[in-house]
Amino acid sequence: MDNLSYWKMEETDDWHGFKGIAKDEAIISPLKLTVVCPGINLETGKYEETGIPGKVIGEYLTEKRVITCKSDLYSTLFLLTPGERDADLEALLTSFLEFEEYYLRDALLEQVLPRLVKQNPERYQGYTIRQLCQEMH
């Protein structure tokens, strides 16, 4: 991966959303991983009918002891290091798959975010993960 061309962002590419960048002005960091959550149409910039806010994903991962760098409206950023082990990345992927399963079956919030429910029982008792996501969306 010594070839810098793998990481260059070109103005003609539409996947990154940057307009007007000069040639060789911007590169992607191979040590940053941004996961984009559903909720905003990336082409139009408009909200979709449903969404999963990045803060919800970030809180879930924190409860699973997976450290995020930051969570925005509909994305979560991870900073990887050269020392990351396969087991660390596997734990991240497994956590995402578990969250997806909880979301698809609309699990109770006390299963998905038990700490949040414990801190605010009267507010979140009986809530489901989709209810929380939709309310924040």
Regions found by a protein language model. Give the residues of each.
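Non-catalytic terminal extensions of PLP-dependent enzymes
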Residues: M1-H137
